[in-house]
Amino acid sequence: MKIEVEAKDGPWFKRMGLPQRGVIMAARRFIDLSITIEPSLPSDPPMMIPKIDYLDHAMGAVQMQDFFPGLKQDQLPGGLGWALEFLSLTTHSGTHLDSPYHYHPTMDMGKPAMTVDEIPIEWCFSDAVLLDFRHKGDGERITREDVICKLDEIKYEIKPLDIVLIQTGADRAWGTPEYLVKGAGMDRESTLYLLEKGVKVVGIDAWSWDRPLPFLAKEFEKTGDPKVIWEAHFAGIEIGYCHMEKMANLSAIGRPHGFTVCCFPIKIKRASAGWTRPVAIIDL
């Protein structure tokens, strides 16, 4: 991206640190890390599959007549009006950012858990690191040791407020029923390792930050141990954090670090999550 500015003399340019005369050059690549919200895809449990009712331009013309008494449809350009969509979905549909309130009413060992409208926006724009665990099988744990080894491999040290992205390859199954059981997942200890480093936002290209629910259910049935249930989510009871789920296209980033992620969530009052369109930004 090339930005050209014809600078004029004045205090605004001095405050902004811009040259009094000249050209500002910027080259960046923007990578969309979200999936598209679509109706009727079987990649969610039935109760969570989005529904979209589309109001086309012809129907919009009819609706506009209610807002403009006396308006005739042929008075509109081409006899057409506005288009609208009516959606029925959850805050966890599509790519979204979960708030600490999703996991439990409290966080940080007893403080009220933040809802998505309370998330500090500075958490959602930061340096990022991509950890590739595509070699792990569906339902496998990504352990604390796995995370440490991967960071050593890519020669990166986590900083406070870094955004950590976990790549499992599950996004390749998006749009199919198999998506619900695809990918490895984080556990309590690996999640806490990141949080203890000062990380506040993480993300994964799978349906859940934890291992897929059917794998958790099978392990619980076998062992009877409730600690296997939602263990990575429940880590947020100890240290509050947010995670993005249903991310996509992480392979397009093309590097393990040296990029920024922007992932501001939609601000919904008292909500456990908000839709987001995360973007990786790479300076070229």
Report residues per predicted region.
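Active-/binding-site microenvironments in catalytic and ligand-binding cores
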Residues: 2-284
